[in-house]
């Protein structure tokens, strides 16, 4: 499979082989990461990477697009079926570009948007001051109730009434609970605002029927195609039919040029996989695993923000152990457990330090792990966090992680191609 790469560019081959080994031997617990199927990767590595196809299916600015049209049509129809959407654009290169296309298609510079605070679990592209969404538009931010650590819908309502936003944004990057999309729509309607939902983190769970679907409530729904959806890295936009032309012209030609047809092919494959019964079982297991992990961590003395999870992820408050997020990330990394430091609501620490870590179960579940494995992992996490500088304890945890990973190989068919185990 990789013979040409190995011969032509041994340096790149070496780096990729090492990454293959890292993925096989580490527990991937970053909530935004997952593993695609081999079929998805084969589509993305296909001859479609050679084809330019500016425009939309059957309305291209280049010849020779008859086969890429088939691929994009498949991606669109599968995506619409997956979420019950009226219209879909599968060309955005990322979730950020999908969000930009929605904003610019409906708003003018200086218009007000109402989104979730980044430090309370929102996303950069929902109006953070360091992002174009918070520079071009007048960004007002809602957050969490300090007692419940749930979205403060009373605050959303109050800010919406006070600032009269043109668009309200729902969705998050570090919020583990169910979002009440109907409530957001009710508030948006009362103040005459459009509603955009960024379901990037929850898309696979929504497709699997274990998390509420925002499509009936929002004029616009954006998503990435990786994370819980297990596709290639990319973005999509779903919308009501009346906004289709606005969205299409803002994706192309205003924000992007030629679509990445090899990535769109991989998206089509992933959407097809997500329509299966097996994927529904996968989504159910992701949530079961997350709850088992959270319960075990709490039993071991850690605090989970909001007291649990309804999704694939959770925020762990490390203050009971007097540990910082950056310390935890580094120590767990030595034990082959990959996590990311993350601010918790009302965090007193800097974003480069933090008082918490974010954990996810989507990738672990793709490997085939179940609740008992989550409890085993939780014990290793706590063991490391209580012994940050104890190399012996960290080595013991790493050995157990290696044993666990070997029981759930990712891509055994490709071991030889990547030189794994040689």
Curated annotation (Swiss-Prot):
Annotated site location: Plays an important role in substrate specificity: 226
One CC-aspect GO term: cytosol
Catalysis: reaction(s): (6R)-5,10-methylene-5,6,7,8-tetrahydrofolate + glycine + H2O = (6S)-5,6,7,8-tetrahydrofolate + L-serine
Chief location: cytoplasm
Pathway: One-carbon metabolism; tetrahydrofolate interconversion; Amino-acid biosynthesis; glycine biosynthesis; glycine from L-serine: step 1/1
HAMAP family linked: SHMT
Chain's role: Catalyzes the reversible interconversion of serine and glycine with tetrahydrofolate (THF) serving as the one-carbon carrier. This reaction serves as the major source of one-carbon groups required for the biosynthesis of purines, thymidylate, methionine, and other important biomolecules. Also exhibits THF-independent aldolase activity toward beta-hydroxyamino acids, producing glycine and aldehydes, via a retro-aldol mechanism.
Location(s) in or outside the cell: Cytoplasm
Self-association state and partner proteins as the record states: Homodimer.
Pfam families: SHMT
Protein name in UniProt: Serine hydroxymethyltransferase
Family assignment from sequence similarity: Belongs to the SHMT family.
Keywords attached to this entry: Amino-acid biosynthesis, Cytoplasm, One-carbon metabolism, Pyridoxal phosphate, Transferase
Sites of N6-(pyridoxal phosphate)lysine modification: 227
PANTHER family xref list: SERINE HYDROXYMETHYLTRANSFERASE (PTHR11680), SERINE HYDROXYMETHYLTRANSFERASE 1 (PTHR11680:SF35)
EC number: 2.1.2.1
Molecular-function GO terms, alphabetical: glycine hydroxymethyltransferase activity; pyridoxal phosphate binding
Residues reported in the UniProt entry to bind (6S)-5,6,7,8-tetrahydrofolate: 118, 122-124, 242
């Amino acid at each position: 499979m990789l013979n040409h790469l190995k011969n032509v560019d041994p340096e790149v081959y070496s780096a990729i082989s090492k990454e293959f080994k890292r993925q096989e031997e580490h527990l991937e617990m970053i909530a935004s990461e997952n593993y695609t199927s081999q079929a998805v990767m084969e589509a993305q590595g296909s001859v479609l990477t050679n084809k330019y196809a500016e425009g939309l299916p059957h309305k291209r600015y280049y010849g020779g697009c008859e086969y890429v049209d088939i691929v994009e049509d498949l991606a669109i129809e599968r995506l619409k079926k997956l979420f019950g959407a009226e219209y879909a654009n599968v060309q955005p290169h990322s979730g950020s570009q999908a969000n930009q296309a929605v904003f610019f298609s409906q708003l003018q510079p200086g218009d007000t948007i109402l989104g979730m605070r980044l430090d309370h679990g929102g996303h950069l592209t929902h109006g953070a001051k360091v992002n174009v969404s918070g520079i071009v538009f007048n960004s007002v931010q809602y957050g969490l109730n300090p007692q419940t650590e749930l979205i403060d819908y009373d605050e959303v309502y109050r800010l919406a009434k006070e600032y009269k936003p043109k668009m309200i944004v729902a969705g998050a990057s570090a919020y583990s609970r169910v979002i009440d999309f109907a409530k957001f729509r009710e508030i948006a309607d009362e103040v005459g605002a459009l509603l955009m939902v960024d379901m990037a983190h929850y898309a696979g769970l929504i497709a699997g029927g274990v998390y509420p679907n925002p499509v009936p409530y929002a004029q616009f729904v954006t998503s990435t195609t990786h994370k819980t959806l297990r596709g290639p890295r990319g973005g999509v936009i779903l919308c009501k039919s009346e906004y289709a032309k606005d969205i299409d012209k803002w994706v192309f030609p205003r924000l992007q040029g030629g679509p990445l047809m090899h990535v769109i092919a991989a998206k089509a494959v992933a959407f097809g996989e997500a329509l299966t019964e097996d994927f529904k079982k996968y989504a159910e297991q992701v949530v079961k695993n997350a709850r088992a992990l959270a319960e075990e961590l709490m039993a071991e003395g850690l605090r989970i923000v909001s007291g649990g999870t309804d999704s694939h992820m959770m925020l762990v408050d490390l203050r009971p152990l007097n540990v910082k997020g950056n310390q935890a990330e580094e120590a767990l990394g030595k034990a082959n457990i990959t996590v990311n430091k993350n601010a918790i609501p009302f965090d007193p620490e800097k974003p480069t330090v933090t008082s918490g870590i974010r954990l996810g179960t989507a990738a672990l579940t793709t490997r085939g792990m179940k609740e008992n494995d989550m409890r085993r992992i939780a014990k290793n996490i706590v063991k490391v966090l209580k012994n940050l500088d104890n190399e012996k304890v960290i080595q013991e945890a790493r050995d157990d992680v290696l044993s666990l990973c070997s029981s759930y190989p990712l891509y055994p068919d490709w071991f030889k191609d990547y030189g794994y185990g040689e």
